[in-house]
């Protein structure tokens, strides 16, 4: 019985104390205005949960920073969007996460909104395979 209780407590501790922020494969819609359509690209990004709390009493002397699962390291890859007109710039550079961590969302490089457009949003509505 004690081993069952220990396993239960260990699992609870792991769920609360350990972050599950990790690399995951996603598909994003890539669009170039000059081309007039979107293509799908597979890339790697960060997803998961981070320990956070929302205090009832907001202390103005201590900022309340909500941590989110975000990239720690990035590389950039470039792809050629097929089917663009010859005069159009058909190269598209996009970020690929190589390491993740729980930290403050950097609004200079990341969409930190609660409900963004999402990675598969295409403003043209036309998705090429």
Curated annotation (Swiss-Prot):
Residues 1-18 form the signal peptide. GO terms for cellular component: cytoplasm; extracellular space; follicle-stimulating hormone complex. This is Follitropin subunit beta. It comes from the Eukaryota. It is found in: Secreted. The lineage of its organism: Eukaryota, Metazoa, Chordata, Craniata, Vertebrata. Coiled coil: none annotated. GO terms for biological process: follicle-stimulating hormone signaling pathway; G protein-coupled receptor signaling pathway; regulation of signaling receptor activity. Heterodimer. The active follitropin is a heterodimer composed of an alpha chain/CGA shared with other hormones and a unique beta chain/FSHB shown here. It comes from Equus caballus (Horse). Disulfide bonds join 21-69, 35-84, 38-122, 46-100, 50-102, 105-112. Belongs to the glycoprotein hormones subunit beta family.
């Amino acid at each position: 019985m004690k081993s069952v209780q220990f396993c239960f407590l260990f699992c609870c501790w792991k769920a609360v104390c350990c972050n599950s922020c990790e690399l995951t494969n996603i598909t994003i819609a890539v669009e170039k205005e000059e081309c007039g359509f979107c293509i799908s690209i597979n890339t790697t990004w960060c997803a998961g949960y981070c320990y956070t709390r929302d205090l009832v009493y907001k202390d103005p002397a201590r900022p309340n920073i909500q941590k989110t699962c975000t990239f720690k390291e990035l590389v950039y890859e470039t792809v050629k969007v097929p089917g663009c007109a010859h005069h159009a710039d058909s190269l598209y550079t996009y970020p690929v996460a190589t390491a993740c961590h729980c930290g403050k969302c950097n609004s200079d490089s990341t969409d930190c909104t609660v409900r963004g457009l999402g990675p598969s949003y295409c403003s043209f509505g036309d998705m090429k395979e």
